[in-house]
Amino acid sequence: MNEKYDEAAQRHWRDAEWLSGEQRTENADQLYGLAAECAVKAVLSKVPGCLSDGELAPAYRKHIDKLWSSILVQGVTKLAPGLQAVVQAGNPFQDWRVEQRYAGDGVVSSSSMASHRQATKRLLGACGLSGSRGT
């Protein structure tokens, strides 16, 4: 498959924003996490050391909660100079799990979703996609 991580990141962000506005917290939170993941993968997919046979290497095919610790800050500095500061600030997705998509309503708090939204917005900006690095 020809992955378009940049397009996917922007699409997930837009859909998450809409769902958030509709008070669909759990689904919005899932998409914020996927948008963040795709933003990072959009950058990593341009780093030769992160590729295998022209695609993102299996070591980087993780969800954002696990992918965070695999981001090669030194390798992405030229492509996404702002990403280093965002990554070094700590993993804001430690409490995000893709498996939460199976959970019932109310499992994701509004404050947790807001934190993931803010982190995703910063990542999108740092990766040169829509959103901004600021607040």
What are these regions (language model features)?
Residues 1-135:
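Terminal alpha-helical segments
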